Amino acid sequence: MTNGISILPHTQPVYGDAAVAAMAERVVGALGPAVVSHAIAFGELTLVVQASDIVYALTYLRDDPACAFRNFIDICGVDYPQREKRFDVVYHLLSLRHNLRIRLKVQTDEVTPVPSVIEVFPAANWYERETYDLYGILFSGHPDLRRLLTDYGFEGHPLRKDFPLTGFVEVRYDQDQARVVYEPVQLTQEFRNFDFLSPWEGTDYVLPGDEKTSA
């Protein structure tokens, strides 16, 4: 221990897939039942974690010197409307010490909050606000969970799969009123179904004599 910093004993460095596999074994063993499942793909470890254990899991990954995932990269949401718990909340971390990345996922629905991780990584503040704004995912314990990217009075959450492509409200600047106005969306034409055969792809013509070839 030097100046309060733990110094790891010198070990032979491990690189590539072997390093990821070794990290997976260590992390899964340490977190135990908090880990629902794990997988290694494209040189990165992904953990699916119980939502109630996300603060515990991130604290361990940050503080254990053998992990040292101290760079908080991002939080994002993913929407799977067909699932009962339709949302994944995905956390991305980086360890500069070990040159490794790790991804944690938790699942939730539209009404069940996920614990905020601001106490572990203060940088999560705006990421959680962005995820709430775009997906409607709630974070319990967040000090200021309000919209971040969309406009005042915005209806809905635009990255949900069931959000209409046109939105609900059009925001534009009105020259006559010299101010921004909000109006219901007015389409210049009705939606059309373009699910037909493209003229560029051609069609299957049956010409005289083709039946001999098929025979």
Swiss-Prot record:
Cellular component annotations (GO), alphabetically ordered: plasma membrane
UniProt GO MF annotations: NADH dehydrogenase (ubiquinone) activity; NADH:ubiquinone reductase (non-electrogenic) activity; quinone binding
The keyword Ion transport is annotated on this UniProt entry: no
Keyword Plastid found: no
Catalytic activity: a quinone + NADH + 5 H(+)(in) = a quinol + NAD(+) + 4 H(+)(out)
Membrane topology: Peripheral membrane protein
Superkingdom assignment: Bacteria
Protein keywords: Cell inner membrane, Cell membrane, Membrane, NAD, Quinone, Translocase, Transport, Ubiquinone
Its EC number(s): 7.1.1.-
Compartments where located: Cell inner membrane
InterPro entries: NADH_DH_suC (IPR010218), NADH_quin_OxRdtase_su_C/D-like (IPR037232), NADH_UbQ_OxRdtase_30kDa_su (IPR001268), NADH_UbQ_OxRdtase_CS (IPR020396)
Family stated for the protein in its record: Belongs to the complex I 30 kDa subunit family.
NCBIfam families: NuoC_fam, PRK06074.1-1, PRK06074.1-5
Subunit structure and binding partners: NDH-1 is composed of 14 different subunits. Subunits NuoB, C, D, E, F, and G constitute the peripheral sector of the complex.
Function: NDH-1 shuttles electrons from NADH, via FMN and iron-sulfur (Fe-S) centers, to quinones in the respiratory chain. The immediate electron acceptor for the enzyme in this species is believed to be ubiquinone. Couples the redox reaction to proton translocation (for every two electrons transferred, four hydrogen ions are translocated across the cytoplasmic membrane), and thus conserves the redox energy in a proton gradient.
Protein name: NADH-quinone oxidoreductase subunit C
Organism per entry: Methylobacterium radiotolerans (strain ATCC 27329 / DSM 1819 / JCM 2831 / NBRC 15690 / NCIMB 10815 / 0-1)
Organism phylogeny: Bacteria, Pseudomonadati, Pseudomonadota, Alphaproteobacteria, Hyphomicrobiales
